[in-house]
């Protein structure tokens, strides 16, 4: 078992990581090979379009590293499905978009590996709650 020097969490555009900040300074302070990481990350996420991909990079004492990519943030998936640039500044007053229950279920299925929900329905409720807090209304929810 290698000794862990640090754990870095970043959110980077898929296939477009560069050695510029935030990647360079975050990995540089642990002495990890920045170019090696950006090449590996870009190769692994090239098929994800323009999504923002959260990544957890574990850097070891011998300066080697491993990384795990996660699913895109829920707010990103909701904005994309509703065709929005950003959520509502006042979600309780101004509604900025609509999603139907099928879209909510689709987002829930995408996020399932990263959620601690026991079922797709439970995950869908989590998605619906996030959407509501962004000022997006949900149509056709089974128990809303």
Swiss-Prot record:
InterPro entries: Ribosomal_uL11, Ribosomal_uL11_bac-typ, Ribosomal_uL11_C, Ribosomal_uL11_C_sf, Ribosomal_uL11_CS, Ribosomal_uL11_N, Ribosomal_uL11_N_sf. One of its GO terms (biological process) is translation. SMART domains: RL11. One of its GO terms (molecular function) is large ribosomal subunit rRNA binding. Pfam families: Ribosomal_L11, Ribosomal_L11_N. One of its GO terms (cellular component) is cytosolic large ribosomal subunit. Disulfide bonds: none annotated. Keywords: Methylation, Ribonucleoprotein, Ribosomal protein, RNA-binding, rRNA-binding. One or more lysine residues are methylated. Part of the ribosomal stalk of the 50S ribosomal subunit. Interacts with L10 and the large rRNA to form the base of the stalk. L10 forms an elongated spine to which L12 dimers bind in a sequential fashion forming a multimeric L10(L12)X complex. Forms part of the ribosomal stalk which helps the ribosome interact with GTP-bound translation factors. Belongs to the universal ribosomal protein uL11 family. This is Large ribosomal subunit protein uL11. The gene is rplK.
């Amino acid at each position: 078992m290698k000794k862990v020097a640090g754990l870095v969490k970043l959110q980077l555009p898929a296939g477009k990581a560069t050695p510029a900040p935030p990647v360079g300074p975050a990995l540089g302070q642990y002495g990890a090979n920045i170019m090696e990481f950006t090449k590996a990350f870009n190769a692994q996420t090239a098929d994800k379009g323009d999504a923002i991909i959260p990544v957890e990079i574990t850097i070891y004492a011998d300066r080697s590293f491993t990384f795990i990519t996660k699913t895109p943030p829920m707010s990103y998936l909701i904005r994309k499905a509703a065709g929005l640039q950003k959520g509502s500044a006042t979600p309780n007053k101004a509604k900025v978009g609509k999603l139907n229950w099928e879209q909510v279920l689709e987002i829930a299925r995408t996020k399932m590996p990263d959620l601690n929900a026991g079922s797709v329905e439970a995950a869908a409720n989590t998605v619906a709650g996030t959407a509501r807090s962004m000022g997006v209304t949900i149509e056709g929810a089974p128990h809303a």
